[in-house]
């Protein structure tokens, strides 16, 4: 074996080893985004001057991500402002001083707090002058990447997110709706759950809730663009068997009440799932805009002290509920269980 060949082989090995280390570091550095939402408030001061308060919330996986990456992405957010008709960029707004807090949104009674699940939230607020003109405006933020282990998204580790909101033309005074609650930190397998995805609207507009397919944005090579791309935005690609109306493996399938925002699900497979829920706002029957919640559900095994549950043989549940009419006869199977070792005596 020649000396030249051995040198080249050694260099090739070193490059391969470096590449593997780099990709591992990149995976830990990039795959950390759990979800987010963007909305705004129309603010009028005493002199009649109109401003818009932009509110952006972003969630990170603080269990598996590099803490330095979270701090980097949490310290600054870029909001692109675009003409809603021509898609022309108007300006880019920097949001700083995000307020950080660890969230623990638990939606179960009698559950033992699990380990290995951690979500941190950054909230940004800034009031700026914006002129919606006659076309309206699109506000957007882009960030990459989603958790690589996301089960329902194709190539999730390279798939980013776009969070956007629409401001109607200036002759329409409007503040966007906003969700009342933080999505769940975790979801328990085989445990029926109803989540409150309701929103409130400062203008009293009519609200309608539905599932949607989240948007892509950013890239592994430019995870947090300081000039977000203009609309229109591409949709993420679902893995086989998943869709906007079937985002989490479950039986019965997930269901959202279009009038109340009540979201019921009984997940039957552990995993990580991207979930898109949006609230549409209508005024006098005219669609004004929407607020989008793009969030990651983590389905895990949970330990319960008490599980109260039943089913009806031959019955079909719709949205977690069984329907009966007067005169019907139903037989209930009690499938509750009691973990005596964990339930305190009373």
Question: What feature does the model see in each segment?
Answer:
Residues 1-34, 324-327, 333-335:
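Bacterial Sec-dependent N-terminal signal peptides
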Residues 28-331, 335-346:
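Long, compositionally biased, intrinsically disordered segments
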């Amino acid at each position: 074996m020649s000396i030249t060949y051995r040198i080249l082989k050694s260099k090739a090995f070193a490059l391969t080893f470096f590449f593997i280390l780099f990709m591992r570091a990149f995976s830990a550095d990039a795959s950390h985004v759990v979800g987010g939402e963007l909305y705004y408030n129309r603010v009028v001061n005493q002199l009649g001057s109109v401003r818009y308060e932009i509110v952006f919330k972003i969630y990170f996986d603080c269990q598996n991500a590099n803490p330095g990456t979270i701090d980097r992405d949490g310290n600054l957010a870029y909001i692109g402002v675009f003409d809603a008709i021509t898609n022309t960029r108007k300006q880019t707004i920097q949001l700083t001083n995000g307020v950080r807090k660890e969230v623990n949104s638990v939606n179960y009674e009698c559950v033992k707090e699990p380990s290995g699940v951690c979500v941190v939230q950054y909230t940004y607020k800034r009031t700026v002058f914006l002129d919606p003109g006659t076309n309206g405006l699109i506000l957007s933020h882009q960030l990459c990447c989603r958790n690589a282990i996301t089960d329902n998204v194709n190539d999730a580790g390279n798939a980013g997110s776009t969070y956007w909101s629409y401001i109607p033309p200036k002759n329409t005074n409007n503040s966007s709706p906003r969700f009342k609650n933080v999505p769940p930190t975790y979801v328990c397998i085989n445990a029926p759950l109803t989540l409150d995805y309701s929103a409130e609207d400062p203008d009293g507009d009519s609200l309608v809730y539905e599932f949607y397919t989240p948007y892509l944005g950013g890239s592994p090579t430019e995870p947090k663009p300081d000039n977000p791309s203009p609309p229109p935005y591409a949709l993420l690609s679902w893995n086989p068997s998943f869709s906007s109306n079937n985002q989490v493996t479950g039986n019965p399938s997930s269901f959202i009440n279009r009038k109340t925002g009540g979201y019921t699900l009984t997940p039957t497979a552990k995993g990580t799932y991207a979930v898109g829920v949006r609230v549409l706002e209508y005024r006098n029957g005219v669609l004004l805009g929407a607020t989008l919640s793009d969030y990651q559900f983590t389905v895990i095994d949970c330990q319960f002290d008490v599980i109260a549950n039943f089913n009806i043989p031959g019955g079909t549940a719709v949205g977690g509920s069984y329907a009966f009419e007067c005169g019907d006869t139903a037989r209930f199977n009690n499938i509750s269980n009691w973990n005596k070792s964990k339930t305190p005596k009373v």
